[in-house]
Amino acid sequence: MADTDDIIDYESDDLTEYEDDDEEEEDGESLETSDIDPKSSYKIVESASTHIEDAHSNLKHIGNHISALKRRYTRRISLFEIAGIIAESYNLLQRGRLPLVSEFSNETMKQNMLHVIIQEIEEGSCPIVIEKNGELLSVNDFDKDGLKFHLDYIIKIWKLQKRY
């Protein structure tokens, strides 16, 4: 039991030493030299709703910017997309769809199907619609320069293969 009394006395002596140190530190510092700024330096926000509205309008602006980028990107056609349009158009012509060209005649029916498909795409009368970024787009909705660039590339390949 004597040992436990010594432990209790030891603990109480330590606590009083720390309490004495805290009191000495508090007495030594004044408000002017402390790390805490006086109340007069704090800014009072009149309403937090202005910050919320600013953040909301900023989010709207960012959302509109992303939508505009998406629309601009949607108008660019990739080589895979044009190849898919050509393949689907070829498939439908094989199954009996009539060509939608401006000068439809018996000569059109005798032409190579690839010539007819390219003519439909160049005239903008190709009936194939693809979905891109949630929008249904026809050949007319895409950038004409990009479309022409990819068609020329595909035609060069076909000419090398002696298909066109």
From Swiss-Prot:
Q: What is its main location?
A: virion
A GO molecular-function annotation: DNA-directed RNA polymerase activity
**Which keywords does this chain's UniProt record carry?**
DNA-directed RNA polymerase, Early protein, Nucleotidyltransferase, Transcription, Transferase, Virion
- Single GO cellular component annotation? DNA-directed RNA polymerase complex
Q: Bias regions of kind Acidic residues — which residues?
A: 1-35
Task: Decide whether keyword Transferase is in the record.
Answer: yes
Q: What induces it?
A: Expressed in the early phase of the viral replicative cycle. Expression seems to continue throughout virus infection.
Disulfide-linked positions = none
User: What are the EC numbers?
Assistant: 2.7.7.6
Entries under InterPro entries matching the protein:
DNA-dir_RNA_Pol_19kDa_poxvir, RPB6/omega-like_sf
Please give the residue ranges the record annotates as the region Disordered.
Answer: 1-39
The chemistry this enzyme catalyses reads: RNA(n) + a ribonucleoside 5'-triphosphate = RNA(n+1) + diphosphate
Q: Where in the cell is it found?
A: Virion
Q: What are its GO biological-process terms?
A: DNA-templated transcription
Q: How does it assemble?
A: The DNA-dependent RNA polymerase used for intermediate and late genes expression consists of eight subunits Rpo30/OPG66, Rpo7/OPG90, Rpo22/OPG103, Rpo147/OPG105, Rpo18/OPG119, Rpo19/OPG131, Rpo132/OPG151 and Rpo35/OPG156. The same holoenzyme, with the addition of the transcription-specificity factor OPG109, is used for early gene expression.
Q: Which family does it belong to?
A: Belongs to the poxviridae DNA-directed RNA polymerase 19 kDa subunit family.
Q: What does this protein do?
A: Part of the DNA-dependent RNA polymerase which catalyzes the transcription of viral DNA into RNA using the four ribonucleoside triphosphates as substrates. Responsible for the transcription of early, intermediate and late genes. DNA-dependent RNA polymerase associates with the early transcription factor (ETF), itself composed of OPG118 and OPG133, thereby allowing the early genes transcription. Late transcription, and probably also intermediate transcription, require newly synthesized RNA polymerase.
* Protein's name according to its UniProt entry: DNA-directed RNA polymerase 19 kDa subunit
Its organism's taxonomic lineage begins at: Viruses, Varidnaviria, Bamfordvirae, Nucleocytoviricota, Pokkesviricetes
What gene codes for this chain?
OPG131
